């Protein structure tokens, strides 16, 4: 029994490594890419004074503000419009003259770049930093999407397996699920044919065969000679020797050519993103998962970001996971938020799955509407 278990274990290990290896590689590349970007941006941007603060624009703004305010009380009401319009010219960088690009803040900036969040209150100010940021995003964003796609396959497998198990419970009734699930989930697959089912035999009579019929060939020496020549030619054709050629390795079994581990890795790379496309669960369930996932972070975030309550923290997490990133909520301790990097990656993938399911439902609705018009039902309703 022990001897027979070794070959099975040897087959399972390469397959398991082949499934985990692409995701681990993508994740390691992303972490390395973020660390390298943090080192580069902290070296370029640290201690730089904002250019906009040195060109006299801020001083001109203050002089104009003093001129507007240096008036009597009777003129104040008339100058309110001028004051309001002038205050709209305020630039945020005037009140943050020196940037603080430590390693952790630079790492936080890199994460906001390739995750396409971009809160807006951390940004490069030097010309080299801006050019480097564009180049960094060109390679970082596709790498982030690769990680999200591979993570999405894992999440889709977990969600699909969990949902199929919960469907077996009594409270998951079919009328309840049929409101939110596509009909494809309830279609019964046809039963396979039994193995012992009799296969109908096709009998062809001798009269239906082409060529001379049995018993119709005249007993002549020419007829027998003709049959002999045909059989001799057929035998000679079958035994014809082909010229020797160079032996080539067959590609019918790629595992022998590449090795079991390499073949498993390549085959799993070809299947990246397929599980997300096949996932199909009810919208209320995925909406509940998104709400619970964001609520967990919203409950933890105010412990170190004391200026945020649960409502504002929930809003901040939602804006982050949907990659909107308005920048209206500024974190006082962004370094702590780096510990939520895995949370952000998984959360972005959950939100992406939710959007994908909503997109599929909208496509189904659109198809049903088009079929409704195509079948002429709308014409008959209008005619009535």
Curated annotation (Swiss-Prot):
Name the source's superkingdom.
Eukaryota
The known PTMs are summarized as:
N-glycosylated.
Chain positions covered by the region annotation Selectivity filter 2: 323-328
Q: Where is this site: Not glycosylated?
A: 96
Q: State which tissues express it.
A: Expressed in dorsal root ganglion and trigeminal ganglion neurons. Detected at low levels in spinal cord. Expressed in regulatory T cells (at protein level).
Q: Does the keyword Phosphoprotein apply?
A: yes
Q: Which SUPFAM superfamilies does the entry link to? A: Voltage-gated potassium channels
Q: Where does this protein hold K(+) 2? A: 117-118
Q: Name one GO biological process term.
A: potassium ion transport
Q: Where are the residues of the annotated region Selectivity filter 1?
A: 116-121
**Its membrane topology, per UniProt?**
Multi-pass membrane protein
* Residue ranges of coiled coil: none
Q: Which residues bind K(+) 1?
A: 116-117
Result of altering residue 110 to R: Loss of basal and inducible potassium channel activity; acts as dominant negative when it assembles with the wild-type subunit; loss of interaction with KCNK2; no effect on KCNK2 and KCNK10 currents; found in patients with relapsing-remitting multiple sclerosis (RRMS); results in increased MS relapse rates associated with decreased KCNK18 expression in Tregs
Location relative to the cell:
Cell membrane
Result for mutant: residue 96 to Q: Strongly reduced current amplitude and localization to cell membrane. Strongly reduced current amplitude and localization to cell membrane
What is the protein named? Answer: Potassium channel subfamily K member 18
Q: Which organism is it from?
A: Homo sapiens (Human)
Gene expressing this chain? KCNK18
């Amino acid at each position: 029994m022990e001897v027979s278990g070794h070959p099975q274990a040897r087959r399972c290990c390469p397959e398991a490594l082949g499934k985990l290896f692409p995701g681990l590689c993508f994740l390691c590349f992303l972490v390395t890419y973020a660390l390298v970007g943090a080192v580069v941006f902290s070296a370029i941007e640290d201690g730089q004074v904002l250019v906009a603060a040195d060109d006299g624009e801020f001083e001109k703004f203050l002089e104009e503000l003093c001129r507007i305010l240096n008036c009597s009380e009777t003129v104040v009401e008339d100058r309110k419009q001028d004051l309001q319009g002038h205050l709209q010219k305020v630039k945020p960088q005037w009140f943050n003259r020196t940037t603080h690009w430590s390693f952790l803040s630079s790492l936080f900036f890199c994460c906001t770049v390739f995750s396409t969040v971009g809160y807006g209150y951390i940004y490069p100010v030097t010309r080299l930093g801006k050019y480097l940021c564009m180049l960094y995003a060109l390679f970082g964003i596709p790498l982030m999407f690769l990680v999200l796609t591979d993570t999405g396959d894992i999440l889709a497998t977990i969600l699909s397996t969990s949902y199929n198990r919960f469907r077996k419970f009594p409270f998951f009734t079919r009328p309840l699920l049929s409101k939110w699930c596509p009909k494809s989930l309830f279609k019964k697959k046809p039963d396979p044919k039994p193995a012992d089912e009799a296969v109908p035999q096709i009998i062809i009579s001798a009269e239906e065969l082409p060529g001379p019929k049995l018993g119709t060939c005249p007993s002549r020496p020419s007829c027998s000679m003709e049959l002999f020549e045909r059989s001799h030619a057929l035998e000679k054709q079958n035994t014809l020797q082909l010229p020797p050629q160079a032996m080539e390795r067959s590609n019918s079994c790629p595992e022998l050519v590449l090795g079991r581990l390499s073949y498993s890795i390549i085959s799993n790379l070809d299947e990246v993103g397929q599980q997300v496309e096949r996932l199909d669960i009810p919208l209320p369930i995925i909406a509940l998962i998104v709400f619970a996932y964001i609520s967990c972070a919203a409950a933890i975030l105010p412990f170190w970001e004391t200026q945020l309550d649960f409502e504002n923290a929930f809003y901040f997490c939602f804006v982050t996971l949907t990659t909107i990133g308005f920048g209206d909520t500024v974190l006082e301790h962004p370094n702590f938020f780096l510990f939520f990097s895995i949370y952000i990656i998984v959360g972005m993938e959950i939100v992406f799955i939710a959007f994908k399911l909503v997109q599929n439902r909208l496509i189904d609705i659109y198809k049903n509407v088009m079929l409704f018009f195509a079948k002429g039902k709308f014409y008959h309703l209008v005619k009535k």
